[in-house]
């Protein structure tokens, strides 16, 4: 059972998404608190009054004094809610790693009060839904603040030029993964925005003919939850250059260069794939951690064994873009996979691939696969030399 600490002040606050039973009588003996998966019954005549004070503003002692209820009762209820993962207990503020702070003390002191800062107010409103995800991670007690702060320090590179890649780029930026960038794959056939790039809502007809990468980077400052000033603007303000993230993830969308993937494997870079399979199927995964999980070549060899040929070629005129509804779904699923790995270090896509059938998109299938005996991805260096 989870118990409250007596050394650190506790400021109880219900997690975003916990619902409370409606009051049906002025003489209640208990209330029920629940989510869609489980619930807790609090048996106390003043349970509703106590829960109403769980806003993160007052400490346990202050709530006890305000209501005239023994501190032991307050802590007992807190312990029940902590055991159900219904409660946050820490007060923290988001650290904006890339928000400019003047080196001049008088100006720095002036900017500390952000109550009238329209940009900061907008950030708070956009941040609330993201915090409501992070707060539910097991063990999180600060409302998801540390989770969101950590996202700013994680680097993601998306390699691709499809609508799915553009959508994924915008989702990760809007989710607080500030250090997300998009790189064109070696198969990129047009450096400018063309008709096939439209339809996702990210790029418009007025963008046709513009440099694709430059235009997407311009829009990134609108999409990003934590916008980053341009390098030129930072230099003008005398701000330090952004620090290159220590943790990184590569997401390969669409066709890819096998030599580039070999480079990722050799250098130990985590990566996963998003693409299209033959027929009416889109795929998310596998997620590859070099030296620990089967790689993309393992999957290719397994598929070749099943089909009976080493490789299938794509006929001329075949569109490699996904239907727009599927593109949105696949981008969202890929973003979920990336965010879970960033937030927790875990993913269900290791040695697995998520299959999304265009004609049965409401039933994605997670298919697992083993290492292929002919693939050397998990061999030791001594085995390779032999």
What does each model-found stretch correspond to?
Residues 1-386:
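Adenine nucleotide-associated cytosolic modules
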